[in-house]
């Protein structure tokens, strides 16, 4: 009796484990998610984690060099991607967007900086502009390096479709992040750069953009086709750059 009960319990445990492992697969199948979708989502997230790590590190190191101890105190003057990744914006949402065929987007943990600590050699607005432009510049540099790697692989005769796909995704992602973050909307980097560039008499423009910044960002995300149209220059630059490799 005990042996029969033990055997039944073991069989029941194996069945439960089997059902538990099959359930997520079944759920993804019902949602129309394929293995290709899952692979694309994972690749995008990995590329995003690296791109954001350099982006946020650039913000942190420039603020640190200007005299602000805040990024160093917060442990942000590092290239460790885990420090800069946001669990929701860098991992969860991009994966869900990729699996559900929604537009891929994401963000990292913003670097906190206090302009009052900046060196007095520049004013605080100029300091904020330098810190802000460092992030998109880091993305542009990553895109250039990635393009160079693609060219080297082609010249060396290395033909690996998987690696090429990943590098092209990383290249395109960095171009997109640079362009998007330079939009003159708060809280994006471009908003802080615009605040520095505007003469004092046009300060009300910056105030308006700061007040309605999140509303404008939501509109960009939610209005069908608007974000895609806005990113047309990115697609043109990407296609032009990739044609140069041929």
Functional labels for PLM-detected ranges:
Residues 1-246:
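Hydrophobic transmembrane alpha-helices and their immediate loop junctions
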């Amino acid at each position: 009796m005990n042996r029969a009960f033990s055997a039944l319990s073991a069989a029941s445990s194996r069945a439960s484990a089997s059902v538990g492992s099959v359930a997520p697969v079944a759920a993804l199948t019902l949602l129309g998610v394929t293995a290709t979708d899952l692979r694309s989502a994972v690749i995008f997230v990995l590329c995003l984690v690296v791109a954001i790590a350099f982006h946020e590190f650039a913000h942190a190191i420039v603020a640190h060099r200007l005299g602000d101890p805040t990024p160093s105190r917060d442990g942000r003057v590092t290239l460790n991607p885990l420090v800069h990744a946001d669990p929701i914006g860098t991992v969860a949402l991009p994966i869900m967007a990729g699996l559900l065929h929604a537009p891929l987007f994401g963000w990292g943990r913003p670097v906190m900086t206090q302009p009052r600590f900046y060196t007095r050699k520049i004013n605080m607005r100029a300091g904020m502009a330098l810190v802000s432009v460092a992030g998109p510049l880091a993305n542009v540099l990553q895109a250039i390096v990635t393009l160079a790697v693609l060219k080297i692989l082609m010249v060396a005769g290395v033909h690996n479709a998987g690696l090429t796909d990943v590098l092209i995704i990383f290249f395109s992602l960095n171009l997109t992040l640079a362009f998007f973050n330079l939009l003159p909307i708060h809280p994006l980097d471009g908003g802080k750069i615009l605040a520095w560039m505007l003469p004092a008499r046009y300060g009300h423009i910056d105030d308006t953009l700061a007040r309605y910044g999140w509303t404008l960002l939501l509109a960009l995300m939610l209005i069908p086709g608007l974000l895609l149209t806005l990113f047309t220059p990115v697609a043109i630059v990407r296609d032009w750059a990739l044609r140069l490799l041929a």
